[in-house]
Amino acid sequence: MGKLDKEFYENKKYHFRYYRKSLNHPFLVAVVIESENDDGKVVLSGFNMTRSIEMVLKNPDKFIRINNPNPEDDAPSFVCVDPIKNKPLKLFTRPIRDWELSLEDEIVIDSLLKERL
């Protein structure tokens, strides 16, 4: 864990949002880490799948799951907060049936998220 990461986890209020791959395969797809800044606004603070998965497993009571806001769409949504407008920002969706992921896919997901930010 780098110095900035260490300071973030020690000094900021934070919570986590996560998605699971599917009902049949409960492994995590991705975790978006958010924190409150000095004004109390929630901002996207970082994304690291491997470390985040470890934190989910160690602290399951601190996590909440966000459901897709569109009930007619069967795709999970990766959502974070736009740090400028402080509004939810929908990054991308993909049908659950297409999620066939392994740990090797985390780099691809990470890249997709960064491209959308």
Regions found by a protein language model. Give the residues of each.
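Short coil-to-beta-strand transition motifs
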Residues: Y19-L28, D74-P76
